[in-house]
């Protein structure tokens, strides 16, 4: 019985120390990336529009070809 109590205590100590271990700090964001994002908040919209204008016609033509084939 004493052995089981000792095993349980060791397990508890290891488990609690694992839970409360300090996590690694997250890396700080690069100041240049933050400045770029703040300077042009609509840059992402331009990328989305570019994908839509180039990819959408290709998708439509692919669908038309598939419908004609079968």
From Swiss-Prot:
Disulfide-bond pairs as recorded: none
Gene Ontology terms, MF aspect: lipid binding; molecular function inhibitor activity; porin activity; protein kinase inhibitor activity; toxin activity
Residues modified to Glutamine amide: 69
Residue ranges the record assigns to the propeptide: 22-43
GO BP term, pick one: monoatomic ion transport
Effect of residue 53 to S: In melittin-S
Subcellular location: Secreted; Target cell membrane
Swiss-Prot/TrEMBL site (Important for the flexibility at the center of the helix, flexibility that is important for the stability of the voltage-gated pore) positions: 57
Distribution of this protein across tissues and organs: Expressed by the venom gland.
Alphabetical keyword list: Allergen, Amidation, Antimicrobial, Cytolysis, Formylation, Hemolysis, Ion transport, Membrane, Pharmaceutical, Porin, Secreted, Signal, Target cell membrane, Target membrane, Toxin, Transmembrane, Transport
N-formylglycine modified-residue sites: 44
Primary location recorded for the protein, binned into one broad class: secreted
Coiled-coil regions, chain positions: none
InterPro entries, sorted: Melittin/Api_allergen (IPR002116)
UniProt keyword RNA-binding, yes or no: no
Signal sequence segment: 1-21
GO cellular component, one term: other organism cell membrane
The family this protein is said to belong to: Belongs to the melittin family.
Further information: N-formyl-melittin major has 80% of the activity of melittin. Melittin: The secretion of this protein into venom follows a seasonal pattern. This variation is synchronized with phospholipase A2 variation, i.e. their production increase in the same months.
Function: Melittin: Main toxin of bee venom with strong antimicrobial activity and hemolytic activity. It has enhancing effects on bee venom phospholipase A2 activity. This amphipathic toxin binds to negatively charged membrane surface and forms pore by inserting into lipid bilayers inducing the leakage of ions and molecules and the enhancement of permeability that ultimately leads to cell lysis. It acts as a voltage-gated pore with higher selectivity for anions over cations. The ion conductance has been shown to be voltage-dependent.
Subunit note: Monomer (in solution and for integration into membranes), homotetramer (in solution and potentially as a toroidal pore in membranes), and potenially homomultimer (as a toroidal pore in membranes).
Protein name as it appears in the record: Melittin
The species this protein was found in: Apis mellifera (Honeybee)
Name of the encoding gene: MELT
């Amino acid at each position: 019985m004493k052995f089981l109590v000792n095993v349980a205590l060791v397990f508890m100590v290891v488990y609690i120390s694992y839970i409360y271990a300090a996590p690694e700090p997250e890396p700080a964001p690069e100041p240049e990336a933050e400045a770029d994002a703040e300077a042009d908040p609509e840059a992402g919209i331009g990328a989305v529009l570019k994908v839509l204008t180039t990819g959408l016609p290709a998708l439509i033509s692919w669908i038309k070809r598939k419908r004609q084939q079968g």
